[in-house]
Amino acid sequence: MTPPPPDSSAIAVRRSPPRSQTNRGKLDLDPVTVAAARDLARRVGRPIVELAEQHTTVSVERATLRLAGLAGADPEGIPWANRLLDAVRGDVGLGHGVALPVWDALVRGEAEDLATLAQKASAGSVRFRLPEGRDRVRARSASRRQVGAGIRRIDARRRERERMVKRYGDPRQSPWIYLIVATGDIYEDMPQAQQAAREGADVIAVIRSTGQSLLDYVPEGPTREGFAGTYATQDNFRLMRGALDESSKELGRYVRLTNYASGLCMPEIAALAGLERLDMMLNDSMYGILFRDINPVRTFVDQRFSRQVHARAGIIINTGEDNYLTTADAVEAAHTVTVSQLLNEYFAKEAGLEDWQLGLGHAFEIDPEVPDSFRMELAHALLARDLFPDAPLKWMPPTRHMTGDVFRGYLLDAFFNLAGTLTGQSILLVGMMTEAVVTPWLSDRDLALQNVRYVLNAAGRLAEDFHPSPDGFIATRARQVLAESIDLLERILAHESGGSGPGLLDAIADGTFGLMKRPADAGRGLEGVARKAPGYLNPATEILEAQ
């Protein structure tokens, strides 16, 4: 299924019409069982949503300031959004939000604009208060005007994307070919990304510098050095988007740009992505919880706000279920991927995202020495496709069992590509035969793209002829994974009935996902969480939730 264009007005004219929810798919899954799985996911996820509604974080509040136009950094490189937030928090706390005290100060004439106010607050020459009565009304009105202007800019960038997709068109084949480019130097990334697009890449992902997810601030400006990646900054987003717009015009197809809204600054990066017209964003709190030890409450709050921004911006999210299989066995833990996909679907839709924006993740990570490994990969991939028929599923290549033998790696990647086209995956991340050896050379990328192009061209519409036997190995395995997923969701709910809080938080603490144990009262960023006080105000949330 070709992924739909990232705009609601274009859904009705997709090349491949959405599959009806009454269509049982190639696996002939029992619709009652599927509905039960979704209901369980909703019941597991709802307490997390309620938790998110009751809290705010430093990054949510800084994102609100950024939407209002606050940018730049002090001479030490600390963003003014951080400086202003810290000053407000020091005077009145975080529980009422940043908007009321900040715009109260502006209305009172403490500064002419946000940037000046941030500079004065950083110097200690401004004191903030919680306004009441008419002062509160004036501060609220002023904050809504300024934040609303930022959200209208996001709306304009979304319409701009829609016009460009209409002008240049989407990729002619499915799945879309997704390629990673990141040297650390944005000025080196741009020509490499443009060349990758010429070689057939439809989506360019600029991975972030190692460890950026643990920074509690967003760096400023264009960057020319990074570690195994390039820093995510607003200027870097703008530069790469401009380069790929040139490629779109040159190639006659719209080339999409991806980055990462995860880690401690998830809401802020989501806001910057919307402002600079990025098209896809990695966005999954579980990755930060499990693999970066970020506090679960912090990142679930951040995730909800960031997904509300993505929904408004028409951005497709990519979730990180593939990461579970880098630490857990891909056969034994297959059901945890399905459970996470079901939960991510619930969380995403609750935040306002639509099916065409749900790039749910999964991966080709079964040990190739396991008998029938390819058949099991097909079963798992087809289960995801049949459970989420209208979602642009993201299919990730083998990494865990890449040994450094480039010939074996090239073969595994070909099988991965074949599985992707047979099972109707939507977004295919190009696998590298040099995985586990070196950061790919340009020649490695060229060979990898040749592999993808050959398989997609040779397979053609083979998926139309692929119909697993209803009682065969593939269908039976898929039903087994779905049954195990339901069993796990029921166990998570049982945790909750014990009265210890949201069952999902207990499951995360127990190491259910990816074998990592992450308790809710620990982890990085916990100090940046605050319970909302009566009278809390966030104009961005008000506007986003009113859509």
Give the location of each predicted region.
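Helix-rich catalytic cores of soluble enzyme domains
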Residues: R140, R144-R159, Y168-Q173, I177-S426, ...
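Conserved active-site loop/cleft motifs that coordinate metal ions or position small ligands
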Residues: I427-G431
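Long, compositionally biased, glycine/small-hydrophobic-enriched stretches that function as flexible linkers
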Residues: T2-D189, Q195-G200, R208-L214, V218-N236, ...
